[in-house]
Amino acid sequence: MRVVFDTNIYVSALAIPGGKAEEAYLEAIRGAFELFTSVAILTETAAVLQNKFDWEQERVRNAIQAIGQSATVLRPRPTLHLLQDEPDNRILECALEAHANHIVSGDRHLLALRQHEGTTILSLAAFLAELKP
């Protein structure tokens, strides 16, 4: 299974230890599925951790490097303008390039799509339920 996490999943996994987002991220590290991300997603994640959570640069850098080691990092060209929030379009582009089965997100605009070009867009709870038989 090929999966793309939205920025909000990474931020929750890193900033809220012991939560469901961290559980999903740890499943990726364990190899339960193939995790894909992009430079744009990592850049946005770094900005949120630094600006909203006051993480120091070195802590942010370490977190982004850890994600980069557990996920395949892609560089899709920004071509989509389907959603008003441009970072949401970067998530869709990453999923397209990864040929992802799922996008996992807490973003209502992405979740409202439900599916895009063969990729199912799931909430974190729905994704975790799918992982557990």
Where are the regions a protein language model picked out?
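Acidic, PIN/NYN-like endoribonuclease modules and their adjacent C-terminal/linker elements
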Residues: D85, L96, R108-P133
